[in-house]
Amino acid sequence: MARTTPIERYRNFGIMAHIDAGKTTTSERILFYTGVSHKIGEVHDGAAVMDWMEQEQERGITITSAATTAFWSGMDKSMPQHRFNIIDTPGHVDFTIEVERSLRVLDGAVFVLCAVGGVQPQSETVWRQANKYSVPRMAFVNKMDRTGANFDKVVEQLKARLGAYAVPMQVPIGAEDGFEGVVDLLKMKAIHWDTASQGTTFEYSDIPAELVDVATDARSFMVEAAAEASEDLMDKYLNEGDLSEEEILKGLRERTLKVEIVPVFCGSAFKNKGVQAMLDGVVHLLPSPADRPPVQGIDEDEKEDTRAATDTAPFSALAFKIMTDPFVGSLTFFRVYSGTLNSGDQVYNPVKSKKERVGRILQMHSNNREEIKEVRAGDIAAAVGLKDVTTGDTLCAQDKIITLERMVFPEPVISMAVEPKTKSDQEKMGMALGRLAQEDPSFRVKTDEESGQTIISGMGELHLDIIVDRMRREFNVEANVGKPQVAYRETIRKSDVKSDYKHAKQSGGKGQYGHVVIELSPMTEEDRKSDNVKDDFLFINDITGGIIPKEFIPSVEKGLRETITSGPIAGFPVVGVKVKLVFGSYHDVDSSEMAFKLAASMAFKQGFAKASPVLLEPIMKVEIVSPEDYLGDVMGDVSRRRGVLQGQDDSPSGKIINAMIPLGEMFGYATSLRSMSQGRATFSMEFDHYEEAPANIADAVTKKG
């Protein structure tokens, strides 16, 4: 079957934003204007098409990125048809993992910002993630109809807080209740959308007299930004003082693709104004798969390799999301980077070293689906029937193996015990948690060996609340939940601490003998660059001359690695430690792998105790927005929680307080902040770093442990 849309007319992009910037409403309008959805769904009444998990509809926040395919021929229907693959991403801090996943497979992004709230803490997190993957992006300043809307202020914040070279493509006509439309700086015309047709029709008119000067200045800034793309454009601009519409778009597109500028559009998705012109911007300014560099990976021989975005290249794809679907079972969402795939084909998963057959291929539209026979370079689709694929795995042709970059997922910072309410829930709970962990790599499940309890870990209280909620709804498992526990870590401060341990047992017949001398040190920045660092631990074998035979060295490392999962202070994982094996001895008959494993484990425990062991606690970056009246109480409370204030900013709803606060002090903070501010203050937090816990905290944790 031939390709229906040339790859140059594909746009794979994500809609990203802070919670409450109006992202889901914006996505809904996109689906409406691209003809997919005939009734506009409103988040306010829990009917949005993109938010298809029950909880999202209740909470009014987007949790799972749903992939949707749509088509666009321009606001005035004059463009050739473009194919949009849109991924809606969550804006809540506990779900940054979802954002990270979708950014990995997108070519571009539209940042939705609130015209009142501006750049908020999550915006910074998502922006940093987009920088990590060099994702070209544009901004859409939404909610221009709301009280306190200020387009210029948001553009300034983009520059000041995110370091973006923001280039407005439009100027708003009015604001708040008086928001009417926009001035298109390319055409230097005013655009008004027709309310009766829900914004599907529009008209151009002359720019209102009071905005002519503002629009002229803004246009000059835009044209200058375009001219800086190349010497030819700059020469023409300097000689003639202007550029044609085509040249401006060419220059701006080049610079957007290089992530040098961020074009800015504005509107009100809720009032059906502005989204249509922003979609034209997606076509003009965001990349097609062919504009992005070939995807990089490594071949079977661990050598670097690439795949170009063409149908003739060998097939390669990345699985970026696994979902359990009530009708078809497990769905694997994947992005095709190169080649073609037909339903029924076999693919190879180099991460698991397994072949799998792709059953059906589904083109997803939010929660509707259409079965298709094949996918090609640039497509995003979902496969049914893949059993052993996890998020971040590569799928490729068996005869041309490539492993694309693995996604790196953060370690969970919070844990809690869960137990089934009834015996019949026991088995179902194990299956439910297994499924949920397969879908979400930032969620972990383990059994505590001592207590036999099931421990779940994740990125925040809301994250775990939603997991427990999903167990109830999707798997009918009722569970009791323990109190949240902080994920502490253990490390050492002293360097070059020697530890010598001999494991020798003689009791008739074959004895046991293993003797090791190790040196413990904290890892340096240089150490961290080593390829041998795994789980934040480095093992170095310094044995020469066969003092310990080669075949026992892996047992020494294994003994060490097994010991660091439960540290000597309070049973938390050990991090940031380097262990050198420097000396030892063996016995021809009595030495065994087990003996060396035990010797290494005991040597580590004894050495760790002598190396100034310390407990580390997770520190959260917290941003609180509070009306001025409650500022004193809020800041006093931050200090009581051992918080360190990082600074203050102004915001339309009061003051923004930035602080670093230990996670152990943040449980139940949402409730206490609400009562302190009569429900008017809000906060968000994300994990920032680990640091040494004060002695009183360490003692309390150790006693508990």
From Swiss-Prot:
Region of interest (Disordered), ranges: 290-309
Location of the tr-type G domain: 8-290
Pfam families: EFG_C, EFG_III, EFG_IV, GTP_EFTU, GTP_EFTU_D2
Molecular function as annotated in GO: GTP binding; GTPase activity; guanosine tetraphosphate binding; translation elongation factor activity
UniProt-annotated location(s): Cytoplasm
This protein's UniProt keywords: Cytoplasm, Elongation factor, GTP-binding, Nucleotide-binding, Protein biosynthesis
GO term, biological process aspect, one: ribosome disassembly
SMART domains: EFG_C, EFG_IV
Residues where GTP binds: 17-24, 88-92, 142-145
InterPro entries: EFG_II, EFG_III, EFG_III/V, EFG_IV, EFG_V, EFG_V-like, EFTu-like_2, G_TR_CS
CC per GO annotation: cytoplasm
Predominant localisation class: cytoplasm
Primary role: Catalyzes the GTP-dependent ribosomal translocation step during translation elongation. During this step, the ribosome changes from the pre-translocational (PRE) to the post-translocational (POST) state as the newly formed A-site-bound peptidyl-tRNA and P-site-bound deacylated tRNA move to the P and E sites, respectively. Catalyzes the coordinated movement of the two tRNA molecules, the mRNA and conformational changes in the ribosome.
HAMAP family: EF_G_EF_2_B (MF_00054_B)
Family of the protein in this entry: Belongs to the TRAFAC class translation factor GTPase superfamily. Classic translation factor GTPase family. EF-G/EF-2 subfamily.
Name the UniProt record assigns to this protein: Elongation factor G
